[in-house]
Design a protein with these regions (language model features):
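Conserved mid-core segment of classical short-chain dehydrogenase/reductases
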Residues: 48-54, 154, 175-192, 211, ...
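The beta1-alpha1 cofactor-binding region of Rossmann-like NAD(H)/NADP(H)-dependent oxidoreductases
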Residues: 123, 144-157, 188, 300
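Catalytic Tyr-X3-Lys loop
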Residues: 168, 184-203, 220, 244, ...
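Active-site helix of classical SDR
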Residues: 206, 240, 248
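Alpha-helical segment proximal to the catalytic Tyr-Lys
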Residues: 211, 253-257
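Residue(s) in the substrate-gating loop at a strand-loop-helix junction
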Residues: 224
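A glycine/serine/threonine-rich, flexible loop-to-helix segment
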Residues: 233-235, 257, 268-292, 296, ...
């Protein structure tokens, strides 16, 4: 397990994201933006009880640390039994230190894959993820960097190939989100962060990975329900997620002649650091309450979808799919 600090200044990226966050918070202090309404009890469909709203008031500094969340996200999927679906494979996961990326890393390891995770700055979260991967009997590589930097992406891929002998699965999962009540509120800096991370980052990492991917390899992109239905306060973010869905389908058509499948998972609300680092303290208490399940998903409820799409034994004829995991037909 190693931490590789690259020349690109990730500290600057984090401070830029926090500046955008502070601007939003200041606007809402003056406008008095209210919180959402409550919910009834959630239906039970999971093998174990899952947390329901309301959750405690909380707000995280970007990019958000999983260790600070209350309740802690569930990512270990103890009811999931591995069966060597990814045995002998190497996977690279962006945004792999926490949230969905962490849960995917754990299940990939349980299925026999070695895992490299790329993350921005949360070293403690990344170490915990790697420790969980290693407990599954797999190897884990930690790589610090900003996916907006194409040189970082090339380096991350090369480090993965050097460490594990190849690259079989790429999961583009890193993202940036900051809400705005109108398009006029979105500054150039805000827009650059969103487009740079959510579109350029996906293209940068995929472009770097492709020369190392052979027939049978798989690329999985993290989309969003906002890319399917839009969101009134996530204008730029929704646009990037729609673009990711289109990129997924286009790459699937482009790469099938090389035997490389490309699919996406489109999650609904998921309890990760991502949203508490965006929403206000009061608003987050009811996060996920308006979904059909009346609660947010836990990361461990998303990760099996990524295993399914990555595994040739499960999804060899699935290509260009946008798999919605919404808790209902419209989230």
């Amino acid at each position: 397990m190693s931490i590789e600090h690259k020349s690109h200044d990730t500290h600057t990226t984090v401070e830029e994201q926090r500046d955008i966050q502070r601007e939003t918070e200041q606007r809402e202090k003056t406008s008095g933006d209210g919180k959402s309404s409550g919910s009834d009890g959630a239906p039970s469909t999971a093998p174990r009880p899952q947390p329901q709203p309301p959750v405690p008031e909380q707000h995280l500094r970007k990019p958000g640390s999983e260790s600070e969340l209350d309740p802690r996200p569930k990512f270990m999927a103890p009811d999931y039994k591995g069966s060597d679906k990814l045995k002998g494979m190497a996977a690279l996961i962006t945004g792999g230190d926490s949230g969905i990326g962490r849960a995917v890393a754990v299940l990939f390891a349980r299925e026999g894959a070695n895992v490299a995770i790329v993350y921005l700055c949360e070293d403690d979260d990344a170490r915990e993820t790697c420790a969980c991967v290693e407990k599954e009997g797999a190897r884990c590589l930690m790589i610090v960097g900003d996916v907006r930097d194409s040189a970082l992406c090339r380096s991350a891929v090369q480090q993965t190939v050097d460490a594990f002998g190849g690259l079989h699965v790429l999961v583009n999962n890193a993202g940036f989100q900051e809400h705005a009540t109108s398009l006029e509120e979105i500054t150039d800096e805000h827009l650059d962060q969103t487009l740079g991370t959510n579109i350029h980052g996906y293209i940068n990492m995929t472009r770097a990975a492709l020369p190392h991917m052979q027939s049978g390899a798989s690329i999985i992109n993290t989309g969003s329900e906002t890319g399917l239905f839009g969101h009134a306060k996530l204008l730029d973010y929704s646009a990037t997620k729609g673009a990711i869905h289109a990129l997924t389908k286009s790459l699937a058509s482009n790469l099938i002649s090389r035997g490389i499948r490309v699919n996406a998972v489109a999650p609904g609300p998921v309890w990760t650091p991502f949203n508490p680092a965006d929403k206000g303290r009061e608003e987050i208490t009811e996060f996920g309450a308006h979904s059909a399940m009346k609660r947010p998903a836990q990361p461990e409820e998303l990760s099996p979808a990524y295993v399914f799409l990555a595994a040739p034994s499960c999804a060899s004829y699935i290509n260009g799919a946008i798999l919605p995991v919404l808790g209902g037909p419209t989230g």
